[in-house]
Amino acid sequence: MVIGGGDTGNDCVGTAVRQGARSVRQFEFLPAAPDARAASNPWPQWPNVKKTDYGQQEAIAAMGGEMRAWGVDTLEVLLDKKGAAAGLRVVDLDWSAGKPERIAGSEHEVPAQLVLIACGFTGPEHGVFDAVGVPVATAGRPLPVMAAEGSHLAARVDGVAADAAPVYVAGDARNGSSLVVNAMADALACAAEIADALEL
């Protein structure tokens, strides 16, 4: 089960298919875009049309039909007795008024053995960094954690003890929203920096 759309959601869907998933579904919070560009959406505006990228194309072919659903709000990830994902509790949304309204009586459960949350490009979670005294810039779009040039070691707010454990950041939290492959490469570089600091 992939929650979210865009390039990240498409990559999740395509990867799941290529790794042999027997069933793949994708839920999108937003309503489905039109199949054709509307007159109210002229060039040079970004075209608001339904996009079916490589991952969805592969999934549709493998699953024998459309595997996406739009206007779906995930309320809860359901767990089995061992704490593993067992499904989702979701509700359908009505966007006709220009904003999401939950449709009464539409709540239902969907089985799932793996849930991938493909909701990105929103910046780091501030609460995590607030808890360890690391400042996060908030001007404009969500920005990454402040770190020294060329380093993964995060800056600290005034008042944090000098001997406090260091905090390292990588991926979107350090560089801003980007591709998963960039975050993975940055995580490896961060791990090497930590290993060096610990003299491992």
Predicted features along the sequence, with ranges:
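Flexible loop/turn segments at secondary-structure boundaries
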Residues: 8-12, 32-36, 76-78, 95-98, ...
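Beta1/beta-strand and adjacent pyrophosphate-binding region of the FAD-binding site
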Residues: 1-6
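Active-site lining segments that contact anionic ligands and/or coordinate catalytic metals
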Residues: 24, 65, 69, 85-87, ...
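Rossmann-like dinucleotide-binding cores of NAD(P)H-dependent redox enzymes
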Residues: 13-76
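FAD-site-proximal beta/loop scaffold in flavoenzymes
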Residues: 96-177
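Conserved beta-strand-loop-beta-strand element in the redox core of flavoprotein oxidoreductases
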Residues: 78-108
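A conserved FAD-binding loop/helix module that cradles the flavin
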Residues: 9-14, 19-20, 170-200
